[in-house]
């Protein structure tokens, strides 16, 4: 199979001026983060010019608005509503417009921007408040600043990857403690506007926890690398993800959920990729915890295109299988994995082939690792597709997405923005 790619010739890249905007460092989520930062910088300039910069009430309100932006943009019901709206866009619209709308999942950049600016405003508030508020409120602001510093330090990408459990505990329990301190300081300050904003963000944050449930599951292990989880509860929308946990106050992890054809419930594939997943596979539970609702995934935005190519590696087949079975958009599947039958089981491979008889399954044990950009382009060209959707690890996803977009081909892929 490798010999096929030697004849694939990639077209010329876009001119440098257009190509630079396709670089991963300038992806839409990063641009949105920058937009929030610049907007706050302008607001700061206006505040200094008009003399309200030193007002504790004003700065506290701006800080809370930034945090509200960061929280609401990730609210599950908002995410699903936005995705549903984009999915209804007529496919007759110009490709450039649909390509832009398909990047709707990059709105997570607003979450990052709101969190960054909200933190900076609160740190500034702690300094500004000196001499303007009583000792009790000043102590509350200092505690907020210290807690924000701890959350920021544990949220750094490298730390988050190496110490995920600590990051998650700090983000959750630190966030709850911070919310309590926000309420204490807002009541002490007596600002009605700040209390209104805080009420909205608190309700948004608590809503998923009101839907906390413990549900029974069946777990099958076709190999030591993967566990296939199924449940007959809560049939989700195709292409969505669901947060699960073995204990409600410990680690939560999100996985793509696959509706079971002709039956209630869902399935998910969990591959060995760390301590939590390894323990899950080696010690499968009889029940898991779920909270909130299943949330629309990145690949749902591919519904705006007339035909797509899915380029998938390994257990990335999980989130893509839901779209294969839903069959909302004509597609070509390219699945690159080691010995698919041995790793994922004959039943899953047969299910994929029934739904996608022309699927390209590249066995890396037999054929080695392919040039993913050439493989993606070959499938894109031969299938007359409009876009490529890649579901893989971070490095490979960005390689394929960037490789396609610098050729002028629409491409989507996870962005790991938080």
Residue ranges and their predicted role:
Residues 1-418:
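FNR-like FAD-binding dehydrogenase module
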């Amino acid at each position: 199979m490798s010999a096929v790619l030697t004849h694939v010739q990639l077209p010329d890249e876009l001119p440098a001026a257009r190509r630079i905007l396709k670089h991963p460092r300038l992806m839409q989520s990063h641009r949105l983060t920058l937009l929030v930062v610049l907007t706050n910088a302008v607001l700061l300039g206006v505040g200094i010019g008009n003399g309200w910069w030193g007002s504790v009430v004003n700065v506290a309100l701006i800080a809370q608005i930034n945090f509200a932006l960061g929280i609401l943009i990730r609210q599950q019901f908002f995410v699903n509503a936005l995705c549903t709206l984009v999915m209804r866009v007529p496919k007759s619209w110009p490709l450039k417009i649909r390509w832009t709308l398909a990047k709707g999942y990059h709105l997570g950049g607003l979450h990052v921007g709101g969190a960054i600016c909200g933190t900076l405003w609160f740190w500034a508030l702690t300094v500004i408040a000196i001499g303007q508020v009583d000792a009790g409120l000043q102590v509350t602001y200092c505690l907020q600043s210290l807690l924000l510093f701890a959350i920021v330090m544990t949220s750094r990408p490298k730390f988050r990857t190496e110490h995920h459990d600590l990051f998650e505990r700090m983000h959750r329990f630190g966030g709850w403690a911070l919310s309590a301190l926000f309420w204490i300081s807002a009541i002490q300050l007596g600002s009605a506007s700040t209390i209104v904003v805080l009420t909205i963000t608190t309700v948004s944050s608590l809503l998923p926890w009101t839907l906390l449930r413990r549900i029974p599951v069946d777990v099958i292990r076709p190999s030591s690398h993967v566990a296939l989880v199924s449940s007959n509860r809560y049939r989700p929308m195709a292409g969505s993800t669901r947060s699960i946990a073995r204990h409600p106050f410990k680690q939560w992890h999100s996985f793509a959920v696959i509706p079971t054809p002709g039956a209630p419930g869902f399935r998910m594939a969990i591959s060995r990729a760390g301590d939590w997943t390894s323990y899950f596979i080696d010690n499968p539970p009889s029940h898991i915890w779920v909270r909130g609702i299943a949330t629309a995934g990145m690949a749902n935005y591919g519904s705006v295109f007339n035909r797509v190519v899915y380029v998938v590696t390994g257990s990335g087949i999980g989130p893509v299988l839901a779209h294969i079975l839903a069959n909302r958009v004509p597609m070509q599947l390219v699945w690159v994995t080691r010995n698919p039958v041995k790793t994922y089981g004959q039943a899953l491979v047969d299910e994929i082939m029934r739904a996608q008889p022309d699927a390209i399954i590249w066995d890396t044990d037999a054929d080695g690792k392919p040039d993913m950009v050439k493989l993606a382009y070959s499938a894109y060209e031969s299938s007359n597709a409009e876009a490529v959707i890649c579901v893989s690890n971070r490095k490979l996803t960005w390689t394929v997405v960037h490789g396609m977009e610098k050729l002028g081909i629409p491409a989507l892929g996870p962005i790991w923005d938080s």
